[in-house]
Amino acid sequence: MIALIQRVSEARVVVDGAVTGEISNGLLVLLGVERDDDVAKADKLAHRVAGYRVFSDADGKMNLNVQQVNGSILVVSQFTLAADTRKGMRASFAERNADPAVAEALYEHFIAQIAGKEIPVASGRFAADMQVSLVNDGPVTFWLQV
């Protein structure tokens, strides 16, 4: 399971012209579910995302997590993160992506785990054509994989 996390001052996702999720200060999480992922991996990744220290403390060091800065998390499904890009000029999705039904269940489970940590969470719509806008703060972007 892959999370591309970006520290943002604002982010939102629009589906069919309607905003489905929007946050101010916090993290935009693009979430990719791989073939062998399971609930245990989703739990571990949610724990890492929630606790990952990407916000500056009083000394300007990245020592604070999203909860410590009263931030929010916007989660957007992103199947292309699991693509095989090792060769050729086109990504392959057949080998590494999870079955869509499994991926959706793990995506929803991940969101529930974040919400269970009392972090405000918003989301896109699984497998929808979405327009995601953000203001990347820093920029600060990390690739987390479990």
UniProtKB/Swiss-Prot annotation:
Question: Which Gene Ontology terms describe the biological processes this protein takes part in?
Answer: D-amino acid catabolic process
Enzyme Commission designation: 3.1.1.96
* EC primary class: hydrolase
Renumbered ranges of motif Gly-cisPro motif, important for rejection of L-amino acids: 138-139
Give start-end of the signal peptide.
none
Provide the protein's localization.
Answer: Cytoplasm
Q: Which Pfam families match?
A: Tyr_Deacylase
Q: Which reaction does it catalyse?
A: glycyl-tRNA(Ala) + H2O = tRNA(Ala) + glycine + H(+); a D-aminoacyl-tRNA + H2O = a tRNA + a D-alpha-amino acid + H(+)
Query: Is Repeat one of the keywords?
Result: no
GO MF annotations in UniProt: D-tyrosyl-tRNA(Tyr) deacylase activity; Gly-tRNA(Ala) deacylase activity; Ser(Gly)-tRNA(Ala) hydrolase activity; tRNA binding
Instruction: Provide the alphabetized UniProt keywords.
Output: Cytoplasm, Hydrolase, RNA-binding, tRNA-binding
GO cellular component terms listed in the entry, alphabetical order: cytoplasm
Top-level taxonomic group: Bacteria
Classification via InterPro entries: Daa-tRNA_deacyls_DTD, DTD-like_sf
- Please describe what this protein does: An aminoacyl-tRNA editing enzyme that deacylates mischarged D-aminoacyl-tRNAs. Also deacylates mischarged glycyl-tRNA(Ala), protecting cells against glycine mischarging by AlaRS. Acts via tRNA-based rather than protein-based catalysis; rejects L-amino acids rather than detecting D-amino acids in the active site. By recycling D-aminoacyl-tRNA to D-amino acids and free tRNA molecules, this enzyme counteracts the toxicity associated with the formation of D-aminoacyl-tRNA entities in vivo and helps enforce protein L-homochirality.
Q: How does it assemble?
A: Homodimer.
Q: What is known of its domains?
A: A Gly-cisPro motif from one monomer fits into the active site of the other monomer to allow specific chiral rejection of L-amino acids.
**Matching PANTHER family, A to Z?**
D-AMINOACYL-TRNA DEACYLASE 1, D-TYROSYL-TRNA TYR DEACYLASE
Q: Which family does it belong to?
A: Belongs to the DTD family.
Mind telling me which NCBIfam families this protein's record contains?
D-aminoacyl-tRNA deacylase
How is this protein named in the record?
D-aminoacyl-tRNA deacylase
